[in-house]
A protein has these predicted regions:
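Long, positively charged, glycine-interspersed low-complexity recognition regions
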Residues: 88, 92-169
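SAM-dependent nucleic-acid methyltransferase catalytic core
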Residues: 1-74, 78, 82-84, 117
Length: 169
């Protein structure tokens, strides 16, 4: 569903608008063949992957250490900046701080991705961080930056983000 709205953000609306009168139509990012092949590739890992569509903090509290030791937590919380304009359910600064504390105590490998903001870098300052550029193509074309934050049990060297991008493409 991420590909049917504006960068996965519900309040942004669908690409091209409800009337599909914009320059970009819904199929600009919803390429059936490409998405189908990605789903098939991902499906080959289905016995090893569990997806949870819930709040990151609630997930950590619910699962925490009850998962196998080799469980990787990948958390993608709402953006820090402009969240109230992008999401129906967004975090307040105190929620981001509470999540950072819970993640720091998590005894499992973890990775968190965020919009690159000084407040986020400070909250996760004890952990390795990798900033990377991102092109926003829905709406006005713009460049931004995001940050990947790696827990102490993640053993990676070099630019992990560029490696992941190669796999995901």
């Amino acid at each position: 569903m991420n590909r049917t709205n504006r960068s996965g953000v519900i309040k942004g609306g669908v690409i091209g608008g409800k009337e599909q009168a914009g320059q970009w139509k819904i199929d600009a990012r919803f390429n059936r063949k490409d998405i189908g092949s990605r789903i098939e590739k991902f499906a080959s890992y289905k016995s090893r992957v569990t997806l949870h569509g819930q709040d990151a903090l609630a997930l950590i509290k619910k699962l925490g250490t009850s998962t196998p030791a080799n469980t990787l937590f990948y958390l993608d919380p709402p953006y820090y900046r402009k969240a109230d304009k992008l999401y129906d359910n967004h975090y307040k600064p105190a929620d981001h701080a509470e999540l950072a504390e819970a993640v720091a105590e998590l005894d499992r490998p973890w990775v968190v991705s965020y919009d690159d903001q000084p407040e986020i870098r400070t909250l996760y300052s004890a952990f390795r961080q990798e900033v990377f550029g991102i092109n926003y193509s829905a709406g006005p074309v713009a460049k931004g930056s995001e940050v990947m934050i790696y827990g102490p049990k993640i053993n990676a060297s070099g630019s992990t983000v560029s490696t992941w991008r190669g796999i995901a493409a």
